[in-house]
Amino acid sequence: MAREVKIGYQNYTIKNLDSIVSKCNEINGQFLASDRIIALSSTEDNISHANTLIHEVLHAIIYQWGIDLDDKEEEKICNTIANGLTTVLVDNPWLLPYIQKNLKGEK
């Protein structure tokens, strides 16, 4: 799955999170700022997997733009926004293509 996502001026590699590590630590994703990695569990279903990616990207945005939050506060914000955004995108399948079209400057 080795892909990259550019956030701010940094590129972050998206990698598979080992399923044993994921299960032992009860996590589906991990943002590793110093390694420039977003690690995702390969055991999640599609919607949950997308939600986890959004969640970890939000952690990267908070880090990259230097937003000063304690860990508990940051986790709550990432969970809330990721869950809300995932729900909006699932419930409105036309929305993401519409946004992409407008970002490309297409009519």
What are these regions (language model features)?
Residues 51-63:
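Active-site recognition of the HExxH zinc-binding catalytic motif
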Residues 1-48, 64-107:
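Metalloprotease/metallohydrolase-associated module, dominated by Zn2+-dependent proteases
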